[in-house]
């Protein structure tokens, strides 16, 4: 099962939908999640980039390539294996942007430990917006970070466009 800590509303909602709730642990009957997703998610959608020519179809028979996600370490010829920095993050976003084989610039392409955690997500999303015009993934490590990602997307794409289109995934 999955523990949903400090979210009693979620527990009530999942229980009423047919999941087995035991305290904070939720167990989903076989097929329940697939049924919910199939009934509510589109089979195909467009993930928009700032450059419309780089927008990609997700779903159907489409294959979408994105960089690796979340590595705390990088490796270079001078220093070998080391913790990632925001400079490394910028370089990976630029590399993904330049690669004709990458459809997205990514999300957390590496974890820049030289930036304080409470503001790191802002620097990362900004890097995607500054160094690439491909679709990207926002930060979802906390509710407020997800909201910050949406707010930055609104600045880049405009409120009306964000309301009616997929400009970020995670």
Labelled PLM ranges:
Residues 1-4:
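N-terminal alpha-helical targeting/anchoring segments
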Residues 6-10:
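Short, glycine/acidic-rich hinge or "gate" loops at secondary-structure transitions
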Residues 11, 27-170:
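Catalytic alpha/beta active-site cores
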Residues 18-20:
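Compact, charge-rich alpha-helical regulatory domains located at protein termini
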């Amino acid at each position: 099962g999955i523990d949903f800590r400090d979210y009693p509303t979620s527990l009530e909602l999942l229980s009423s939908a047919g999941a087995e709730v035991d305290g904070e642990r939720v167990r989903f009957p076989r097929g329940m999640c697939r049924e919910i997703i199939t009934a509510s998610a589109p089979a195909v959608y467009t993930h928009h980039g700032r450059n419309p020519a780089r927008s990609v179809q997700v779903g159907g028979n489409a294959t979408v390539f994105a960089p690796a996600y979340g590595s705390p370490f990088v490796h270079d010829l001078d220093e070998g294996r080391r913790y990632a920095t925001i400079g490394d993050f910028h370089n990976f976003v630029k590399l993904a942007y330049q690669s004709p084989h990458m459809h997205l610039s990514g999300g957390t392409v590496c974890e820049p430990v030289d930036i304080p955690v409470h503001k790191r997500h802002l620097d990362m999303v900004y890097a995607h917006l500054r160094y690439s015009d491909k679709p990207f993934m926002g930060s979802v490590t906390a509710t407020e970070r997800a909201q910050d990602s949406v707010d930055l997307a609104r600045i880049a794409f405009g409120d009306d466009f964000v309301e009616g289109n997929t400009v970020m995934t995670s």
